[in-house]
Amino acid sequence: MAIILYGNRLSPFVEKVHRGLMLKQIPFQQHEPHGPFDLRRNNPTTGKMPALDLDGQRLFDSTLILRALDEFKPEPPLLSPDPPIAAQQRLLEDWADESLYWYGMVLRWNIPANTTRTIKLICKDLPPVVRPLIKLMAPRFVASQTRAQGLGRLPLNVLLQELDRHLANLVQLLGDGPFFFSTSQPSIADLAVFGQLGFLYSPVTPEGTAAVEKYSELLEFCQRLDAMTD
């Protein structure tokens, strides 16, 4: 039975699932999309990355996929057996996916120089026939999404101040433990935060890289998780 992950690791949600598969040592193949139509073909439910073929099912949404992986291969678990800690892990994962993610999106798509770099990065592995469509459609579409979400309406200095506060809060939550909530084993929360920090810490978003580099604790956290899932 082939397990196939559909998506590009430039997406923090694909990276989250990729690291989960590696953590559980589940062999898999990765198929990258060759254009926007592949997204709908690979994931007809939502048309987004990632999707996963697992045990004869086509799964979607990174949270739902990792939940299914925990059932497919329970060890190592992605949630603590302690219900209060597991609840905190689920909440942090959801916050990383639904809130922290948008800081990276604004930095990529609402700053012209970063948008140019982002499009170049996205297009380099796409067929030449698709690139003009991406260059034309993506900036306008994604920037409108960030404004509708709210963060895209903030002045850049305010956005970066808020991002800094969130990163400082993550350091407090991490504490002295190797992973969040003083656990020795990465959880679904760690995978989600790792994916979003990597999304911020990118050559296309120097502002995000500078923000993360202020916190050595977060860089060391990423190094630990990377070593366990490389």
Regions found by a protein language model. Name each.
Residues 218-224:
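Intrinsically disordered, low-complexity polar regions and short flexible loop motifs
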Residues 97, 167-171, 226:
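Structural signal for well-ordered, non-membrane alpha-helices
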Residues 71, 95, 197, 224-227:
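Residues within well-ordered alpha-helical secondary structure of globular protein domains
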Residues 102-213, 217:
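GST-like fold's C-terminal all-alpha helical module
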Residues 1-132:
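GST-like domain detector, emphasizing the conserved glutathione-binding G-site
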